[in-house]
Structures are given as structure tokens and as C-alpha cells.
Amino acid sequence: MEDPSGAREPRARPRERDPGRRPHPDQGRTHDRPRDRPGDPRRKRSSDGNRRRDGDRDPERDQERDGNRDRNRDRERERERERDPDRGPRRDTHRDAGPRAGEHGVWEKPRQSRTRDGARGLTWDAAAPPGPAPWEAPEPPQPQRKGDPGRRRPESEPPSERYLPSTPRPGREEVEYYQSEAEGLLECHKCKYLCTGRACCQMLEVLLNLLILACSSVSYSSTGGYTGITSLGGIYYYQFGGAYSGFDGADGEKAQQLDVQFYQLKLPMVTVAMACSGALTALCCLFVAMGVLRVPWHCPLLLVTEGLLDMLIAGGYIPALYFYFHYLSAAYGSPVCKERQALYQSKGYSGFGCSFHGADIGAGIFAALGIVVFALGAVLAIKGYRKVRKLKEKPAEMFEF
């Protein structure tokens, strides 16, 4: 501190050493443990630089301990290779720096002399079995033996195979792929068309036209004319009273003439009905075949043509039904039909009336259903054409007819 006058206080002087004091005898001496003193047998060190803590160790015991440690290390590496057989030898530089005690070997080449992508040279550890080369085909999977206690594949599970990539890499994984089971008839690429709406309409059109053809053929098959038992008439006459023995002489000849005249009245309309139904059946079968072969995909204008034809057919069924029943009603209302009916009723037969029978009515019903089915087919064909044009512009999408 400074006094008010500004004079600095003098610093305290150190205390002077006592000249009569005697120094301590162990002042400059380092204190060593008894075993660290010169001449102590426990002061000896082992070959690895660690001090021995007991006087019973010798170099042979140290060498045996080092050998046990190396064997334990080898067992650990063998366990690692068993867990991961595709893994190569471990590159432990601090472990493989030199040969083990009691072993002789050739040192590895320096890293500078190795190629960049080449395989590593032999090391002191045993190398794992090498994998297949990139140019070699992978080995096929081995079949499982009967006595193998491995996992059994359930019967419903599809057959599978395993594929190993050809390029060996650490941690390589097995790729497992499945083969699909045998597909059904409609699962193939082309037959899938039969499950679409257009194909169902086309097959229904085929069925309806076949039924119309069958109904029309009933009237066409009756060749007409009286047939006695000795002449063995057709099945139609046996069922509807054509084969009988009630007429003889003039009545039999008159019945034969009336049958031929009535048959000639119905023949034109029945023939036209059979021809039209047969032609439509063939046309619908052609459309189904083209759909299975995917012809409309390559030529979309065929879909437009199909749609127009379906609309024309659906519209043509209406006047066809009118003319069909008009001509049939004219034939059933003719004097020939009435005289024929009276002749057969006089002999007790009632199957020759002047009215529409079941085959004529069935043909009309199937034709009416055909109008609806063909109209629906025309709509689906136009929609299919629009979708094909859209897919032609965007081929990434997929559409099945």
C-alpha cells in the first residue's frame, strides 16, 4: 500500500537460512521399493517388457501362454468362417504383422505390389473357400434328402428355387424366387379375352342364333305329305300324328296333298330364317376368333366395323320378326291350313291346328333377346375402339380386350 505522502512501502526481506542447521541424510535420495533395488531377483523383466511379479516365471511358460493365446484366436476365426462361409479371410494387420512363435512362413508382399482389384495373397490364416467366378454359372440347388431334418415345404406352397449371384461379394445374400403353378385354360395370354364383356356378348350372340336355327329347322324338316306305317315316315310325323293308319283311299291322298301345300306356304320364311341365323352364327364366331388373336389391337378400325354391324343386326331383327310372324300368320290363316285341320280333326287328331306352335314362338323369343345382346355388343365395341386409341397414345398402360 502507499501512504498518503506517496512513498512506497519496502518489500519484506526473506528469512535467512540458519547456518547451524544440519541437512537431512536422506534428502537427495530416491525411495525405491525393495524389489526395485539393484540385485533383487524379482527386478528381472520378461521378454515382452512387463515386470514379473513373482520369481517363478520362466521363458518356457511365457512361450506356452503365447501359444495358447494364438490357438484361442484361431478358434475364434474358425467360428467366424463357419458363421459366414462366403466371407474372405480377415485382414487384421495388427495380428498378421509377423509369424507366430514357433512357426516359419513367408512374409506377404507389400501392399504397393498388389493389384488394385486382385485377390489378396496367402496369409498366415487359412483362407476361406473361394466363391464362383463372375463368368461361371451358379451351381443348381441340391435336392433335399429324405432323412434331412430340415424344414418341409407345405404341399400348397409353389415350387421355389434359389439363385446365388455370380459375383462374390461380402455379405452376399441368396435370392429366392418362386415359379407359378400350372395355369388353367383361361389363364393364358390369348384366352383371357374370353373372360371380357365383349367376348361374353359375342358368345351369347352365337348361342341365340344357334337356337333360332334349331327352331326354324323343325318346320323345315317336315317334308309334307301323308305317310303310312308301311312307308316309315319321319320322326316329326310320328310325334305330331303324321304316321297314322286312320286314312285310306281318297282321304289319304287328300291329306297328303294338303300337307304338301301347307309346307310350301311356310317354306320361304323358314328358309330365310335358317339362312340368316346361320350367317349370323358364323359372323359372331369370326368376331370371337379375331378377339382371341388380338386383331382389333393391330387394326382398331375393325372395332368400328363390328360396332356398326352389331347395330345393323340389332335394328334388322325388328323388321325380321315382323315379316316372320306376318308370313307365318298368313300361312296358318290360309284355306289350305283350315281344310287340313278339319280333315285331321275328323279322324280324332288335334296336333294339326292353324296356330303358332312352340318352335315358331321360341324363334321369336330368341330373336327378341338377340336385339338386346347385339345392341350391347355395339356399345362395347365402340368403347373398345376408344380405349385402343387411348392406349396407342399411351403405350405404358395395358388393356385386355
Curated annotation (Swiss-Prot):
Coiled-coil-forming residues are none
A single GO BP term for this record reads: protein localization to cell junction
Tell me which UniProt keywords the record has, alphabetically: Cell junction, Membrane, Tight junction, Transmembrane, Transmembrane helix
Q: Which GO molecular-function terms appear in the entry? A: mitogen-activated protein kinase kinase kinase binding
* Annotated Basic and acidic residues bias: 1-119, 145-160
Localisation per UniProt entry: Membrane; Cell junction, Tight junction
What spans are recorded as compositionally biased (Pro residues)? Answer: 129-143
All copies of domain MARVEL, residue ranges: 193-386
Bilayer-spanning residue ranges: 227-247, 272-292, 301-321, 361-381
Which topology term describes how it sits in the membrane? Multi-pass membrane protein
Q: Where is this region: Disordered?
A: 1-173
Q: Which GO terms describe its cellular component?
A: bicellular tight junction; cytoplasmic vesicle; membrane
Has UniProt tagged this entry with the keyword DNA-binding? no
Which residue intervals are topologically Cytoplasmic?
1-226, 293-300, 382-401
Q: Which InterPro entries match?
A: Marvel, MARVEL_domain_protein_3
Stretches in topological domain Extracellular: 248-271, 322-360
- Give the PANTHER family listed for this entry: GEO08273P1-RELATED
Function, in words: As a component of tight junctions, plays a role in paracellular ion conductivity.
Name of this protein: MARVEL domain-containing protein 3
This chain's source organism reads Homo sapiens
List the gene name. MARVELD3
